[in-house]
C-alpha cells in the first residue's frame, strides 16, 4: 500500500478526495535515484514504495565509512528494497551492525523481517524508542558510533509518540524522519507537541536535513522556520474567524460554532463535501485542540454537539 504509515496515522482521511491534487503534486517531485551516495558518510536507498503520501518512497540511509555501518529505517517491506540492500552491501563489501527505526509506522518498519532473514545477526541489532519485544530502546541524547559516524538521538514526538531523529555530528546534519519532509508537510498526531518538537529540532542547529521522504533538505533551519510559520498562520486564521463570528453575534450571546461552521467561515461553503468531512474537519479540530491547550479557545457540548468559542 503506497500510502504507508500515513494511512495508519490518518485513519479518517480518505485519500481519494485528494487524488487530483496528489497526482499533480507527485508529478512535480524531483526524481531520486534508487541508490545514491549523498555524502562520504551517507548512502540513500529508496524503499520502492512511492505513493501519494510516501512521495518518492521511504528513504533508508546507510551511515558510516567503514566495513560495519548502521541503517536508519527499513521502508515498507517490499522485496525490491531488500534486493537493493543486498546488492548495495555486496557491491561495497560492507555490512550492517545496527538498525535504527525512527518510529512505528509501517513504511519505516516493514523491512525489518527481510533484514533479519538476510542477515540473522541483526535480530539483536534493532533499536527503537518504545521498542517492541526483542528490540533495544533508544533514549534522548543516546550516542551511537560506527567508523566515520557519530549519531546522537533526539526524541521528537508529535508526528508519532515514539518518533526519534538522529544528529550526524560529523556533518552537522540531522535524519529528520517524518517530522520534516523533503517536500510538503507531515501529518501529525498532536499539533502542539509537534510544534514544540520542531522548535527543539531547530535548536540543534543542524545545517542539512536527511528526511524520511523526499530530497535532501539543504537548509534545515529555513525549512523548519517555514513549517512553523505555516502552522502559526493556520492558528491565527482560526482565531480571526472565531473573532469575526463573535462580532456578528448579538451582545451577550456566546459565539460558539461547530467545526463545520468554522470551516464555512474560513474556507467558504463551496468546499467539496468529502474534502470537508475527511480532511478539513479533522485538521481544524486538531488546530482547535492546540489552541485550547494554549488557553485561547474552549468548547462546550450541548445535546451531543460540540461547539467552540474564543477566550481572548
Swiss-Prot record:
Alphabetized UniProt keyword annotations: Hydrolase, Metal-binding, Zinc
Entry-linked InterPro entries: LACTB2-like_MBL-fold (IPR047921), Metallo-B-lactamas (IPR001279), RibonucZ/Hydroxyglut_hydro (IPR036866), Sec-metab_biosynth-thioest (IPR050662), WH-like_DNA-bd_sf (IPR036388)
Reactions mediated catalytically: atrochrysone carboxyl-[ACP] + H2O = atrochrysone carboxylate + holo-[ACP] + H(+)
Pathways involved: Secondary metabolite biosynthesis
Cofactor binding, note field: Binds 2 Zn(2+) ions per subunit.
Binding site for Zn(2+) 1: 103, 105
EC number: 3.1.2.-
GO molecular function, one term: metal ion binding
Residues binding Zn(2+) 2, per UniProt: 107-108
Functional note: Atrochrysone carboxyl ACP thioesterase; part of the gene cluster that mediates the biosynthesis of the tetrahydroxanthone dimer secalonic acid D. The pathway begins with the synthesis of atrochrysone thioester by the polyketide synthase AacuL. The atrochrysone carboxyl ACP thioesterase AacuM then breaks the thioester bond and releases the atrochrysone carboxylic acid from AacuL. Atrochrysone carboxylic acid is decarboxylated by the decarboxylase AacuI, and oxidized by the anthrone oxygenase AacuG to yield emodin.
Protein name: Atrochrysone carboxyl ACP thioesterase AacuM
Species this chain originates from: Aspergillus aculeatus (strain ATCC 16872 / CBS 172.66 / WB 5094)
Gene expressing this chain: AacuM
